């Protein structure tokens, strides 16, 4: 996009000139520069070193994101089998920054309050390594469905995908979470170069309207944070009303919240106290400008809730219905699966709802009354005298966890045919067993299930996932 094809609103330009001073010409020139493209490695499935050795297309490390890489505009990483295996997430480089600046650890209870389409939620889920709990919420049902798909693709088993209002979540989770991500709905000024429609629709009033929503959201989020916990607030806008002023609003209304330092980078700019309420602590906020970084515009602030965390013991799961367990156990034995996401398979976490089996997150909680799309990992369906595994289960299995595998090169045309829903011819030496359920892998990384009969792999890749 450039200034001539999509004129920027005069009020926006006037404000940016006042904000940036002598940097304004460089900022304006950035709108004529090509945008950058990035992908983030799913470190719960593959190391960055292994990805670099495997990648069939050239990449360059994003210097401020440990597991982030630039790729060229003419490359289509979503067409690569590694994408279907959930090894990476396509994300604008600056948008990777917020999740990289909140230190999520395995076992944490994490909330992503406005999570769709899943860029930050998948990053948080990967950091949890299958331990703890991730509550990923979006108020829009259609967006929550897209969020669920991305979490399934990433193989995140310990997630509760909610489709609820923040006000209702606040009542359900008072001071419950160790870490919270609030990527607030905003005017999107930082994305004008990437999405021209945002620039066309911008008005001076929109930013003020959204700032009122953000002020409400940030207070609600703070109420769900445990003492000693961390909360990351981010926007993709330059507007002080949505950035420093929203941060100031929280600090003024919640004296138990304070700003925390984040890992810095030479290209980052920082919050400006005068753009908020004058609090010098606002310099701890980070601003990303497109004329100073290889990325779009972003703002982020990290908060800590004062006080000491009191670790509560997790409540036990409800007593599982074990009538269906033999069918599931028979399948797990057939494919030789004893661990899931590096953790021993825990039968206490298996829940049967109707004819479907789920693997609940290790942190049990009473979610009654909350509208949700998924609680845990969808294992599969119970059909008469057999168990049919799900696609999310296939993607939650890590490399080398299952024994009954058929591992082909990602460049093997049979992988492409499998992803289209076709049956495959398999040589005897390529399969672990002569018949039965197998996990098809691309260079060892699971893509989906198939059933082997007479050297023919019957395709079990769901129609809704096919490419």
Stretches found by the model and what they are:
Residues 1-54, 296, 306-467:
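Polybasic, low-complexity RNA-engagement segments
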Residues 37-96:
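Conserved AdoMet
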Residues 107-116:
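Conserved class I S-adenosyl-L-methionine
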Residues 117-130:
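Conserved SAM-binding loop of SAM-dependent methyltransferases across substrates and taxa
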Residues 128-129, 225-227:
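Helix-to-beta-strand junctions that scaffold the AdoMet/dcAdoMet cofactor pocket
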Residues 137-175:
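S-adenosyl-L-methionine
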Residues 142, 179-219, 236-243, 269, ...:
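Mobile active-site "lid"/loop adjacent to the S-adenosyl-L-methionine
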Residues 177, 230-233, 238-358:
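Class I S-adenosyl-L-methionine
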